[in-house]
Design a protein with these regions (language model features):
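Conserved alpha/beta-hydrolase catalytic His-Asp/Glu region
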Residues: 132-164
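Active-site glycine-rich loops that stabilize anionic/oxyanionic intermediates
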Residues: 11, 19-22, 85
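Structural cue for short, hydrophobic secondary-structure segments
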Residues: 16-19, 43
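Active-site loop/oxyanion-hole signature of alpha/beta-hydrolase fold enzymes
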Residues: 28-36, 40-42, 46-82, 86
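Flexible "cap/lid" loop of the alpha/beta hydrolase fold
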Residues: 92-97, 101-137
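Alpha/beta-hydrolase fold catalytic core
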Residues: 1-14, 36-39, 76-77
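Active-site loop signature of alpha/beta-hydrolase-fold enzymes
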Residues: 22-23, 47-52, 113
Length: 164
């Protein structure tokens, strides 16, 4: 799958993988800082997030292969890799399967263990949104409000909505 990414700077390649419900621009301010420090920074929208394609297949092995495809397509070698939360799981899987491609690995806010489901209310809220009839983010927010009371969480989820 061809993932959407943003690139800034030049130097040692640094790939940044966001967490669940995140997207590439979550890391814009740090990407600029890393670019100033001599990195070619790739902030990536993982599958089913941001501007990357959506697909029913969605597991860490598949997601790591998506990142591998990006590395290959961009002719990158020995990348530094930062993964946050879900992106950390993807980064760890990539590092295990393709250690020769990874120079440095930084995993933020996750560990290599199984976690029980804990986003059930968020998933129920997202499943309740019928995008075939909604036309605006405000309409989606109204549906989400039936499940999620926290303003910040709702806004974070709404940021990931794109009509094509």
């Amino acid at each position: 799958m061809k993932l959407f990414y943003r690139k800034i700077g030049s130097g040692q390649p640094l790939l940044i993988l966001h967490g669940l419900f995140g997207q590439s621009d979550n890391w814009n301010s740090l990407a600029k800082l890393f670019a100033e420090k001599g990195f070619e920074v790739f902030t990536i929208d993982l599958r089913n997030h941001g501007l990357s394609p959506h697909d029913d297949e969605w597991d860490y092995e598949t997601m790591s292969k998506d990142v591998l495809e990006l590395i290959t397509d961009c002719n990158l070698q020995q990348v530094d890799l930062i993964g946050h939360s879900m992106g950390g799981k993807v980064a760890m899987r990539l590092a295990i399967d393709y250690p020769e491609l990874i120079n440095k690995l930084i995993v933020v806010d996750i560990s290599p263990k199984y976690y029980p489901i804990h986003h059930q209310s968020v998933l129920e809220a997202l499943n309740a949104v019928d995008f075939s009839i909604l036309k605006t983010r405000k309409e989606a927010e109204t549906v989400l409000s039936n499940y999620i009371t926290d303003f910040g969480t709702k806004q974070f989820l709404l940021k990931n909505i794109y009509w094509k």
